[in-house]
């Protein structure tokens, strides 16, 4: 029975995420070095967004090249952690008065050399706001969130996603990012005796700023820039953290 249930869920998700009319996808790869005092490693991100007649699909995969931080004395011979998100906005009423409102389905999960990042399932609504020329966009989401084997006082996540193209009238300057706030009872600041502090909420935002330098020499795929991760009680770190990153982005 359990196997049949998992198969049914997998088939439903496949239908939601992949059985959609063909459309051009926006795909990019980012290589960022994290200067955070507790990080100091490289992350490779593969990101995709695809719009279609039924809504849109978004996913990203992060590979953290920090194996040596998980296994002391080991060379940095492999990613120390991988994290994956995939989300589908369903909208069958794009020609109606509520065209900016979509249903949202999402999965998050990952693994590190030291600990798992538990499966999370999210469902809710997304509201889309944009400028007339679509250069500036904002998505606001209210989502029910279930994290496997985790407790929360309020099983919800609130999300904002934004993009601003040609910022300040500068061609090729892009400011984008996201902000997430959710409830999750979790341990932070673990001590040698195994004890830790307990927190109830998590906040993280990662604003990015990119400049398309490639436009000046005929290579429009190449951008330079970075991001700043601002978080509170994120992962196993308690309190507020600011972690700046610099890197390159290639749009396929």
PLM regions and their residue ranges:
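Residues on the lipid-exposed face of transmembrane beta-strands in outer-membrane beta-barrel proteins
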Residues: 46-50, 86-90, 123-129, 142-144, ...
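Residues that define the transmembrane beta-barrel architecture of outer-membrane proteins
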Residues: 25, 40-44, 78-84, 117-123, ...
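Short loop/turn motifs that connect adjacent beta-strands in outer-membrane beta-barrel proteins
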Residues: 23-26, 54-56, 91-102, 130-138, ...
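Outer-membrane beta-barrel transmembrane domain signature
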Residues: 145-221, 230-233, 250-252
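Outer-membrane beta-barrel translocator domains and adjoining extracellular loop/strand segments
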Residues: 70-75, 114-118, 151-153, 187-195, ...
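Cleavable N-terminal export/targeting peptides
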Residues: 1-26
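Transmembrane beta-strands of outer-membrane beta-barrel pores
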Residues: 31-37, 63-67, 105-113, 129, ...
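Short glycine/proline- and aromatic-enriched beta-strand/turn motifs that initiate or cap beta-hairpins
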Residues: 23-67
């Amino acid at each position: 029975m359990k196997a049949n249930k998992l198969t049914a869920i997998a088939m439903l998700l496949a239908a939601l995420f992949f059985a959609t009319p063909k459309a051009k996808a926006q795909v990019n790869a980012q290589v960022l070095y994290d200067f955070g005092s507790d990080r100091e490693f490289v992350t490779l991100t593969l990101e995709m967004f695809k719009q279609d007649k039924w809504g849109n699909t978004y996913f990203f995969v992060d590979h953290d090249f920090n194996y040596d931080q998980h296994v002391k004395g080991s060379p940095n011979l492999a990613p120390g952690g991988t994290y994956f998100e995939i989300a589908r906005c369903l909208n069958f009423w794009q020609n109606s008065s509520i065209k900016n409102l979509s249903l949202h389905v999402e999965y998050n999960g990952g693994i590190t050399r030291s600990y798992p990042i538990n499966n999370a399932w999210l469902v809710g609504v997304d509201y889309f706001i944009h400028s007339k020329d679509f250069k500036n966009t904002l998505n606001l989401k209210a989502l029910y969130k279930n994290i496997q084997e985790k407790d929360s006082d309020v099983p919800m996540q609130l999300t904002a996603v934004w993009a601003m193209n040609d910022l300040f009238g500068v061609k090729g300057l892009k400011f984008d990012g996201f902000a997430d706030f959710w409830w999750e009872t979790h341990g932070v600041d673990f001590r040698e005796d195994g004890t830790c502090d307990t927190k109830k909420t998590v906040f993280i935002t990662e604003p990015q700023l990119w400049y398309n330098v490639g436009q000046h020499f005929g290579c429009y795929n190449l951008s330079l820039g970075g991001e700043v991760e601002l978080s509170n009680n994120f992962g196993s770190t308690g309190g507020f953290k600011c972690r700046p990153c610099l890197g390159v982005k290639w749009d396929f």
